[in-house]
A protein has these predicted regions:
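Transmembrane beta-barrel domains of outer membrane proteins
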Residues: 63, 85, 126, 146, ...
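Short acidic/polar hinge/loop motifs at secondary-structure boundaries
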Residues: 100-127
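Transmembrane beta-barrel outer-membrane domains
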Residues: 75-77, 113, 168-172
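Cleavable N-terminal targeting peptides that direct proteins into the secretory/outer-membrane pathway or into
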Residues: 1-21
Length: 188
């Protein structure tokens, strides 16, 4: 009987040590822009802002139409909604600088996203369930349009841009003016 109690005490002490050595898994998420694409496991695609401006594209869906697994649901001039892996509408979240855009585009497929593509620095697309780390309800994917409205680095050269867009179908017009400069250490 003494051997039984001794074995029970020794096994209890050994199991305490086993439980003390277990460590929980820690998941760390960060901003989409601080890592290179090759470092990420998530299916992240980045479209450079210069490519967007050079293409003269009018809608967010049309901009991303060339990416694998992404196409546009075209509802007329400048109303191309992004479709990621067959999901659109409320299943695809649109963010601007990491903040969910709440506009009338979520109400119906024929409403345009209120995103200024002419001022975009880059467009980040996360597809699939990993997009739930960045916005709720976006099981299809998340599109983050990053602009330089809050500069993260010092501006080294003066840049001035003007964009004008017209649409003949609905007599729509859009004008964008952007000016960037560093004056005495202050980004303007």
């Amino acid at each position: 009987m003494k051997n039984y109690y001794l074995a029970l005490i020794v096994s209890a002490l050994l199991t305490i040590n086993i439980f003390a050595e277990e460590v929980e898994e820690v998941v760390v998420t960060s901003s989409l822009t601080k890592q290179t694409v090759s470092d990420l496991k998530d299916p992240l695609h980045v479209v450079d802002g210069d490519d967007v401006k050079a293409g003269g594209i009018q809608s967010l869906g049309e901009t991303l139409d060339e990416l694998l697994g992404v196409h546009t649901a075209d509802f007329g001039a400048a109303v191309g909604q992004p479709v990621i892996r067959g999901m659109s509408g409320s299943r695809v979240r649109v963010l601007e600088n990491g903040v969910v855009v709440r506009d009338v585009a979520a109400l119906g497929p024929d409403h345009v996203n209120d995103i200024n593509l002419l001022n975009s620095q880059q467009i980040e697309v996360v597809k699939g369930p990993s997009s739930l780390l960045y916005a709720n309800g976006g099981a299809g994917g998340v599109i983050n349009v990053v602009d330089n409205s809050i500069a993260t680095t010092n501006i080294t050269e003066r840049v001035m841009s003007l964009g004008v867009e017209t649409q003949s179908v609905n007599n729509g017009e859009a004008v964008d003016f952007s000016y960037e400069n560093n004056i005495s250490g202050f980004n303007v």
